[in-house]
A protein has these predicted regions:
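Hydrophobic core of transmembrane alpha-helices in multi-pass small-molecule transporters
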Residues: 17, 88-134
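Intracellular loop-helix junctions on the cytosolic face of multi-pass helical membrane proteins
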Residues: 1-5, 110-121, 129, 133-134, ...
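Short helix-loop-helix connector
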Residues: 38, 70, 143-147
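Transmembrane alpha-helix boundary/hinge residues in polytopic small-molecule transporters
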Residues: 25, 29, 61, 133-141
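Helix-loop boundary and gating motifs at the non-cytosolic
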Residues: 1-56, 255-260
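Juxtamembrane helix-start elements in MFS-like secondary transporters
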Residues: 41-49, 76, 116, 120, ...
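Small-residue-rich transmembrane alpha-helices and their cytosolic helix-loop interfaces
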Residues: 16, 49, 53, 124, ...
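Central cavity-lining transmembrane alpha-helices of secondary-active solute carriers
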Residues: 45-69, 82-90, 164-170
Length: 260
């Protein structure tokens, strides 16, 4: 891989790195804390954690909104930056709600606070919405920024960094929690570790997300379009329902939706 695509892949990969870390913290840590330590019914925990996946269907809408922005303006970066900020803030809120659930359940003699649980579900739905918005714009940015020959190599590095984020997320939990990761750790030490994590992780996610797109799209505008060439802007002239109907003419899209 040449130096320019490699540098681009490493920079953009930081966004996927942050999502890998987030996935470990939500699916591996918060999910376990809700079921094992707080003893929330597994069904409710699954609804809360899985709520973010329900918003994957919003990707088409966010992608359409991004494509409708004039080519002379930043089309992808605002979505990615907004997504990064929202994910960082909402993860901090999710950690605080988990802590509140614990103290509330202890104070009420084991009764689950329905309001806090409902808020936690909404927060996870918000995280899923932010991931859908940022992830769609991120994929479009890669397509805008690379040629057809470069794209497979850039994507391999970018998604490889997603896997690296999973490993780093595990390391982050071990470093922040310390002895609270032990099987016989007390609940108070686990909650103290979660409190520390709610302060450290949002800053890390925010930093990775912002650095990943810093200057990328501004450079793209000048590099990818020859002087005097105005690209066809078909998505600006078609409504979202019309674009979705066009998917029916693509055999691969039909098979993919059938699998879903």
């Amino acid at each position: 891989m040449h130096s320019r695509p490699l540098r681009l892949a490493m920079q953009l990969g930081l966004f996927q790195l942050s999502l890998g870390i987030l996935g470990v913290l939500i699916l591996g840590l918060l999910n376990r804390l809700l079921i094992q330590d707080i003893q929330v019914p597994a069904v409710l925990a699954a609804v809360a954690v899985g709520g973010q996946q329900l918003m994957g269907f919003a990707r088409a809408w966010f992608g359409h909104r991004s494509d409708r922005i004039p080519i002379s303006r930043l089309r992808r970066t605002p979505f990615i930056v907004s997504s990064t900020v929202a994910i960082a803030l909402l993860f901090c809120v999710a950690c605080q709600l988990v802590l509140r659930l614990t103290t509330s359940k202890e104070a009420s003699g084991g009764e689950l606070n329905g309001l806090l649980m409902g808020l936690l579900i909404l927060v996870f739905v918000g995280i899923g919405t932010a991931i859908a918005a940022g992830g769609t714009a991120f994929s479009a940015l890669i397509a805008d920024r690379t040629t057809e020959a470069e794209r497979p190599r850039v994507l391999s590095v970018v998604w490889g960094m997603r896997l690296l984020g999973v490993l780093l997320g595990s390391v982050l939990v071990n470093q922040v929690f310390g002895s609270a990761c032990a099987a016989d750790a007390s609940r108070s030490s686990v909650l103290a570790g979660l409190e520390r994590l709610s302060l450290v992780t949002p800053l890390l996610l925010l930093g990775l997300g912002l650095v990943s797109v810093f200057g990328v799209e501004r450079r793209t505008t000048g590099l990818m379009l020859p002087a005097g060439l105005v690209p066809p802007d078909v998505p600006q002239r078609l409504a979202l329902p019309q674009l979705l109907l066009q998917l029916r003419t693509i055999p691969q899209a039909g098979r993919f939706l059938g699998v879903l």
